[in-house]
């Protein structure tokens, strides 16, 4: 008997301590960009019992009341009562922010391509150099309507549903911290066949009974989110498997910006270059180039040029032009990967300034990405999720 082909991804809710930190960092970024679109921001946050520490490097003309932004973010998440172990009204906020290193700023503000021109006129999109070296990945698949792998798509939707039920008051005992995990079984052709296992752990009031939690999560969350045809009598459910989850959020664990990078992206289905997103402005290619790579991959798949596509980009600090672009369609392409690469070079400008212009990234749009994933979102409008390059790609490839 052959083994099942299983793949698992997880997600966490907005009340998870690492996600609290991400949301604070991105809320600060947005508040700065609202006043100063060209600010350089690298903002990190640590949260733990009763305390928030904000630190990093910021160069801006804006004035932002950091403590106020922190408290409003915590309030919006739902930590509004000391009973939950973390309260926006009483939490201590400590801020330690300095200006961006002049050595880094030199390469970002004037790319190597410009510095080598000896005062000659240059392409304005060569002006911004990459904020660091590194490699970034983008991925898309036709496995779901949002062009995301099924396991991470469902994992996000499960914790988002928990949050919606909590905020609406429909399930009054729910608290902000939660995690989900979905295991998908694939057939021999790599097509999603069924859901093998669902794990959900949700923080709850001390008065809630395990039987009540189990029934509500099964019926009001899992069965409301996962299509019935993917669930069967063999599907396994683990609901709060420790038996109790009253102590949660930053009271239960410390949280740090950038510690949920797989949740933020493709749930482990595609590689990750290692750089986190939250708290970083668009000159940081960890963030902007990852968005651009997703944009490229999604448009390729949406155009019907491949069933799945993976894009790798790499950069050198202070240099505008990518040091490499790699395309892999895993044998599903309707044209060769080399042809796709040539088309990408014609259709997409992948220099940092080109990405910023193409995706309009100098706006305060980042807070909405800091929970429930940066990709495949259908509840918010994100520029890198648009499929507006489909026709241009087809035209370049003669399709």
From Swiss-Prot:
EC number(s) stated in the UniProt entry for this protein: 2.5.1.6
Catalyzed reactions: L-methionine + ATP + H2O = S-adenosyl-L-methionine + phosphate + diphosphate
Ranges for region Flexible loop: 100-110
Chain residues that bind Mg(2+): 18
Keywords, ordered alphabetically: ATP-binding, Cytoplasm, Magnesium, Metal-binding, Nucleotide-binding, One-carbon metabolism, Potassium, Transferase
Sequence positions that bind K(+): 44
GO cellular component: cytoplasm
Pfam family membership, one: S-AdoMet_synt_M
Classification via PROSITE patterns: ADOMET_SYNTHASE_1, ADOMET_SYNTHASE_2
UniProt binding sites for ATP: 16, 177-179, 244-245, 253, 259-260, 276, 280
Known cofactor(s): Mg(2+); K(+)
Binding locations of L-methionine: 57, 100, 253, 284
An individual GO BP term: S-adenosylmethionine biosynthetic process
Subunit structure comment from the entry: Homotetramer; dimer of dimers.
Family statement drawn from the similarity comment of this UniProt entry: Belongs to the AdoMet synthase family.
Function: Catalyzes the formation of S-adenosylmethionine (AdoMet) from methionine and ATP. The overall synthetic reaction is composed of two sequential steps, AdoMet formation and the subsequent tripolyphosphate hydrolysis which occurs prior to release of AdoMet from the enzyme.
Name used for this protein in its record: S-adenosylmethionine synthase
Source organism per UniProt: Lactococcus lactis subsp. lactis (strain IL1403) (Streptococcus lactis)
């Amino acid at each position: 008997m052959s083994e099942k082909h299983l793949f698992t991804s997880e997600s966490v809710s907005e009340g998870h301590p690492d996600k609290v930190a991400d949301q604070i960092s991105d809320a600060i970024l947005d508040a700065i960009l609202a006043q100063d679109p060209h600010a350089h921001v690298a903002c990190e946050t640590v949260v733990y019992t009763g305390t928030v520490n904000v630190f990093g490097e910021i160069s801006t003309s804006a004035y932002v009341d950091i403590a106020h932004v922190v408290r409003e973010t915590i309030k919006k998440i739902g930590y509004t009562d000391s009973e939950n172990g973390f309260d926006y009204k009483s939490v201590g906020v400590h801020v330690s922010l300095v200006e961006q290193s002049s050595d880094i700023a030199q390469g970002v503000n004037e790319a190597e391509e410009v510095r080598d021109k000896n005062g000659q006129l240059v392409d304005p999109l060569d002006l911004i150099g990459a904020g660091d070296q590194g490699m970034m990945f983008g991925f898309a698949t036709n496995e779901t309507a949002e062009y995301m792998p099924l396991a991470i798509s469902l994992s996000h939707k499960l914790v988002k549903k928990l949050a919606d039920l909590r905020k609406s008051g429909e399930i009054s005992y729910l608290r902000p911290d939660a995690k989900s995990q979905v295991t998908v079984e694939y057939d021999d052709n790599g097509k999603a066949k069924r859901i093998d296992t669902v794990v959900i752990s949700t923080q709850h009031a001390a008065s809630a009974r395990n039987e009540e939690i189990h029934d509500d999560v099964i019926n009001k969350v899992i069965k409301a989110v996962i299509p019935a045809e993917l669930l069967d009598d063999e599907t396994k459910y683990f609901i709060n498997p420790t038996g109790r989850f009253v102590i949660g959020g930053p009271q239960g664990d410390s949280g740090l910006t950038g510690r949920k990078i797989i949740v933020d992206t493709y749930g482990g289905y595609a590689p990750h270059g290692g750089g986190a997103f939250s708290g970083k402005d668009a000159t940081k290619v960890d963030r902007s180039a990852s968005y651009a790579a997703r944009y490229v991959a999604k448009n390729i798949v949406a155009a019907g040029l491949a069933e799945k596509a993976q894009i790798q980009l790499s950069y050198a600090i202070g240099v505008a032009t990518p040091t490499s672009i790699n395309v892999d369609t895993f044998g599903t392409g309707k044209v060769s990967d080399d042809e796709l690469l040539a088309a990408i070079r014609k259709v997409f400008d992948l220099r940092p300034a080109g990405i910023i212009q193409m995706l309009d990234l100098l706006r305060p749009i980042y807070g909405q990405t800091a929970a429930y994933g940066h990709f495949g979102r259908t509840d918010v409008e994100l520029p890198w999720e648009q499929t507006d390059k489909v026709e241009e790609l087809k035209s370049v490839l003669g399709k």
